[in-house]
Amino acid sequence: DDAVADGEHAISGVVDS
């Protein structure tokens, strides 16, 4: 998905926690 939310990457919906 697109990097919209804070902590989210432009990769395949990978959330950086």
Curated annotation (Swiss-Prot):
Tissues of expression: Expressed in skin glands.
GO CC aspect terms: extracellular region
Protein localization: Secreted
Domain of life of the organism encoding this protein: Eukaryota
Keywords per UniProt: Secreted
Record function comment: May act as an antimicrobial peptide.
Family, similarity comment: Belongs to the Frog skin active peptide (FSAP) family. Septenin subfamily.
Entry protein name: Septenin 1k
Protein source organism: Osteopilus septentrionalis
Source species taxonomy: Eukaryota, Metazoa, Chordata, Craniata, Vertebrata
